[in-house]
Amino acid sequence: MITILGAGKVGMATAVMLMMRGYDDLLLIARTPGKPQGEALDLAHAAAELGVDIRISGSNSYEDMRGSDIVLVTAGIGRKPGMTREQLLEANANTMADLAEKIKAYAKDAIVVITTNPVDAMTYVMYKKTGFPRERVIGFSGILDSARMAYYISQKLGVSFKSVNAIVLGMHGQKMFPVPRLSSVGGVPLEHLMSKEEIEEVVSETVNAGAKITELRGYSSNYGPAAGLVLTVEAIKRDSKRIYPYSLYLQGEYGYNDIVAEVPAVIGKSGIERIIELPLTEDEKRKFDEAVQAVKKLVETLPPQLRE
């Protein structure tokens, strides 16, 4: 069973996409009475229209997630116009700690995937408060960041984004750093296809993509995160050993300990199987460090009970 914690925009977009991909045992949990039940019923009716067999239910009780093999955490407040991910920290950290206790009590064997922002810090809280192995506490971010970079590259070059391999590291926020040197199109290094100015434009568009969506429509991205969550579920369920970037707890990788950072990793049926350490230049190491320090700063502002 796949449990989605939170029946808001991201949670419901995820549920719809999972249904359309054939995942037929879904549970929505949210605190608002009637909200997850109504959403589940609406989605069940849609499935009937489409001829899709699905078992989906809604609940206000966290006990109902017993037996879940994957828990997708989408609960929390979304980013409002003008609000940074960092400003979400205090508002969502307590929610993560509370959900961690619920997951630990009722779904102790589940793989937990977090999309609540600021996701790097929220993943740190979830890891610390569940006490789960780090392989089973995964912050979703990098798939979306890299996909955004691939989209902007494809738009500038007039090619399919399926041919683009884009890499973003560090964190999900303003200190994320796209890595043009390690990105390519059809196997050709990006630096051979685009000018320095064009690459700088792609980097800027990628970093500011989330804020642009929020500014344009008044609330943060939901379809993008949902699509990435679905890819993550598929990689776990199919044991496909895909390499995706995630926000993960580091234990010596890239020279860091006791912090979460966005790095590429192999994912399969047990969660994260290994973190891939890319060869970085001195300038790239500096940018990676800036991202890590930004996450550390966020974590250090949390009360001790949320980070220990």
Swiss-Prot record:
Top-level taxon in the UniProt lineage: Archaea
Name listed for the protein in its UniProt record: Malate dehydrogenase
Extra remark beyond the main annotation: Ala at position 30 is responsible for coenzyme specificity. Asp or Glu is present at this position in most NAD-specific enzymes. The next residue, Arg, is important for NADP binding.
UniProt KW keywords: NAD, NADP, Oxidoreductase, Tricarboxylic acid cycle
Active site per database record: H172
pH dependence: Optimum pH is 11 for malate oxidation.
GO terms for MF: L-lactate dehydrogenase activity; L-malate dehydrogenase (NAD+) activity; L-malate dehydrogenase (NADP+) activity
EC code: 1.1.1.299
Record: residues binding NADP(+): G6, A7, G8, K9, V10, G11, N92, T115, T116, N117
